[in-house]
């Protein structure tokens, strides 16, 4: 099939600036490049780092870049925003969509994949004969979404990253075979413990060999539950060997600018400054070196996290997981790999108790670690890509 993929209009693909959703796109584009299943054109914002990316040499995948950052593009975006007030997305995203649409209308695509942007369907209405597929990684289409029925009806297929997201879509309707779940995957070869002599020593992270080091990785934002984790650490103030490594910043790739929440968080952690280290943003390729230093991963999301890759990465590194009964998280783990907590009024206290329990029971951690390694094999990027393209077969026979 001849396929167009409309990206989010925020981060570039290939994923030279990171972003989980952009990484997922890279995975199935890489798979398509190897197996040559379809002819795919990706519509993405431009970034200078894509210029010499090897993905651009593919014979089956091509890229159409929209400039949104040059001074001329910024002027055009500003003018666009002045004349378009009632927009479904931010005017910068809508500008990207308009520029991409100018090219799309010249092409005869069989299928257009709207990547995490189901609202794009409004702009495409009546302007293409292609079938629309929504590829959802977040809760962006449910009964509370603006124009939800119109958007739902416009799709030939809706692929979601978890049953949680699929069930949210089904609050609108449950048409036969329209909704399918395809679990995301990760680079298992990257996230594996390897006997290397890297420069990341435990002492650099403020811990010794006899310490119990926990890791939190992800965006340092309120909904990720990091404040509750710090509060749990404060309840464990009399346990000097329990330490925490916080990996991440408030936004992807942002190593310098701290928002008010991050500043408040560090102030709260001040009494435990010798036991909590904030690494800031860590490049994706360096993440395994940090994770392998930890004994346990704590991912205490207090919102309905659709399918956080941090859970998959932790299990692939053989880390026992402490997380929550929110969103798609229960779909990523088993009772043998993780301890899941309710985010109720007792959450912080129960989080502290769970941390202390794993600290005091190394044999339990060892069993959970072995189970995590085994379970993680279900979430390879290859299986993800294969299942994604298998889902597309549902509509292939109906394409002209």
Regions found by a protein language model. Name each.
Residues 164, 185:
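Carbohydrate-associated surface elements
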Residues 126, 258-282:
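Nucleotide-activated donor-binding/catalytic signature segment of Leloir-type glycosyltransferases, i.e.
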Residues 192-207, 387:
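A short helix/loop element that forms part of the nucleotide-sugar donor recognition site in Leloir-type
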Residues 350, 357, 364-378, 390:
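A short, well-ordered alpha-helix in the C-terminal region of glycosyltransferases
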Residues 243-263:
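Glycosyltransferase donor-sugar binding loop
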Residues 159, 208-224, 230-233, 245-247:
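Conserved donor-binding/catalytic core segment of Leloir-type glycosyltransferases
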């Amino acid at each position: 099939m001849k396929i167009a993929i409309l990206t989010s209009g925020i981060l570039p693909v290939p994923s030279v600036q990171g972003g989980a959703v952009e990484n997922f796109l890279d995975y199935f584009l890489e798979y398509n490049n190897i197996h040559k299943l379809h002819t795919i054109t990706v519509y993405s914002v431009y970034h200078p780092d894509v210029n010499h990316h090897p993905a651009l040499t593919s014979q089956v995948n091509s890229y159409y870049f929209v400039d949104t950052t040059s001074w001329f593009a910024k002027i055009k975006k500003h003018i666009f925003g002045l004349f378009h007030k009632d927009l479904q997305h931010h005017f910068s995203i809508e500008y990207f969509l308009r520029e991409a649409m100018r090219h799309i209308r010249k092409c005869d695509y069989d299928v257009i994949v709207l990547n995490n942007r189901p609202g794009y369907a409004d702009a495409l209405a009546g302007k293409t004969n292609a079938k629309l597929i929504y590829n959802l990684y977040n809760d962006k289409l449910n009964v509370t979404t603006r124009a939800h029925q119109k958007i739902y009806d416009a799709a030939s297929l809706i692929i979601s990253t978890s049953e949680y997201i699929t069930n949210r879509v089904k609050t609108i309707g449950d048409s036969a075979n329209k909704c399918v779940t395809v679990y995301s995957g990760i680079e298992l070869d990257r996230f594996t413990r390897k006997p290397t002599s890297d420069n990341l020593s435990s002492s650099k992270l403020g811990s010794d060999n006899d310490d119990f080091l926990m890791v939190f990785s992800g965006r340092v934002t309120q909904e990720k539950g990091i404040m509750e984790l710090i509060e749990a650490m404060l309840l464990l103030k009399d346990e000097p060997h329990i330490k925490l490594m916080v990996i991440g910043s408030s936004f992807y790739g942002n190593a310098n600018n701290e928002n008010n929440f991050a500043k408040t968080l560090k102030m709260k952690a001040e009494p435990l400054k010798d036991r909590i280290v904030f690494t800031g943003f860590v490049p994706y390729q360096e993440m395994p070196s940090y994770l392998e230093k930890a004994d346990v991963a704590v991912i205490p999301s207090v919102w309905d996290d659709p399918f956080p890759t941090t859970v998959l990465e932790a299990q692939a590194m053989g880390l026992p997981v402490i997380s929550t009964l929110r969103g798609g998280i229960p779909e990523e783990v088993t009772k043998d790999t993780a301890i899941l907590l309710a985010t109720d009024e007792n959450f912080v206290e129960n989080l502290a108790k769970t941390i202390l329990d794993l600290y005091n029971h190394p044999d339990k951690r060892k069993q959970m670690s072995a189970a995590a390694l085994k379970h993680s094999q279900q979430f390879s990027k290859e299986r993800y890509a294969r299942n994604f393209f298998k889902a597309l077969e549902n509509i292939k026979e109906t394409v002209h």
